[in-house]
Every structure is written in C-alpha cells, then in structure tokens.
A protein has these predicted regions:
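Cell wall/extracellular polymer interaction/catalysis modules
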Residues: 2-6, 11, 33-187, 193-198
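Long, intrinsically disordered low-complexity tandem-repeat segments
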Residues: 10-28, 32
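C-terminal helix/juxtamembrane-tail motif
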Residues: 197-206
Length: 206
C-alpha cells in the first residue's frame, strides 16, 4: 500500500502547519461532517488510509485521517510516547505502523446500544486494527476527549486542544466509505507521526 505524505493543500485543510502543540488548532470545517464531503473520493476502492499525527500534548495526540491521499477527518488518540519510552496502560497511543483493518469485529462495549445507540446501525462492529504490538482491541470509534480512548483512534472535527466534535456523523461517514470498499480486497491503515511534528515529553512517573 502506498503511504501518501500530505501535500501543502491537504496540510492546510487539516491544519498541519504545526504550531506549538496545543495552540491554534484548526478552525471548524463544517464541510468535514456532511454526508458527502467535497474532499471525499468518489471511487469505491481504497488504496490507502493514513493517520498523520500532527499535534502532541501531554494528554492527547491530534491528527488527520487521509483516504487515498485526501483529507477525510480529524483524529484524536491518547498521548504519544517518545521512542523507547514505556507504555502507560490506557494512557498512551499505539506505535507507528501499518495495520490490517477489519470491519467484522463486534465490540462488546459498543454492542451495548442503551449507552451507545450510535453503534446500532453497525451491529456494534467498529474498524479493528489487527496485531498492534502491546495492544489489544484497538478500534476506530466515536468520542470527544482523551478520556474516551484507552489507545483507540477517535474521529471527528478538531476545534480545541485535546478535543474533537461531531464525532458521530464523522464516524457514520467513515463507515459508509469503508463499506463501499470491495470486501475481497484487504484494508490497511498506516499510523505515522508527521515529520514536522514534535513530541511532548511524557512524565514516566505519572
């Protein structure tokens, strides 16, 4: 699978100009969460899915998800570890890498439709990242803050440090896009720290 480095136009759309972490996050882009974004490719085949991590704080990692090299939505993960730093269970993001993406794994947590009614249309099935080193059950799902993820990738629209909004409509749009991909062709996702980004140090004693 080809990994696309964001172009200058796409970086502007995703606000990857990389100011100091936690400051001057992208203004709300109201087109991001419409049913048919102008940035969404009309093709059914997905050649690449990439999460570029662009903003790092001591609490969270903000990024941008690209499909076939085009900006699709913002992402939020737990804070990212500097290379060699130990994992803090439930508090740190997954390692950079390329992972098989499955759409056939039902999450027990999100199968509780009383508390997660947005998951009912998908029968509790979330995009599942396979074989992530040191992590189990890594999903792409709905949420707003670092408290909503223990290592998973949240999707939405970034409007403030450590916070995303419009997560439910963004997730719906993502699922509809992924489901259009031919089932017999494997899906993969690449998670990368943007080369211009800077990691915030993590206090190992916390």
């Amino acid at each position: 699978m080809t990994t696309h480095t964001p172009t200058s136009n796409n970086l502007q759309a995703a606000n990857a100009n990389l100011p100091a972490a936690g400051n001057n996050l992208p203004a709300a882009d109201h087109n991001v969460d419409t049913a048919q974004s102008s940035n969404e490719t009309p093709d059914t085949d997905i050649a690449s899915i990439t999460v570029w991590r662009t903003h790092f704080s001591t609490n969270a990692t903000l990024g941008a998800l690209y499909i076939n090299g085009k900006f699709f939505c913002h992402t939020l993960e737990p804070r990212t570890r500097p290379k060699g730093a130990p994992k803090i269970p439930g508090k740190t993001a997954i390692p950079e890498g390329k992972y098989r993406l499955s759409l056939n794994v039902a999450s027990p947590r999100f199968s509780d439709y009383k508390h997660h009614p947005w998951a009912r249309p998908w029968s509790g099935k979330m995009p599942f990242l396979c074989n992530v080193p040191g992590f189990n059950g890594v999903l792409i799902h709905v949420g707003n803050t670092p408290n909503d993820t223990a290592g998973c990738i949240l999707v939405g629209q970034a409007t403030a440090p450590d916070f995303i909004v419009n997560s439910i409509p963004t997730f719906r749009r993502l699922m509809l896009r992924l489901q259009r991909h031919p089932r017999h062709i494997p899906l993969y996702i690449c998670v990368r720290n943007h080369p211009k980004s800077r990691l915030c140090p993590i206090g190992l004693g916390e």
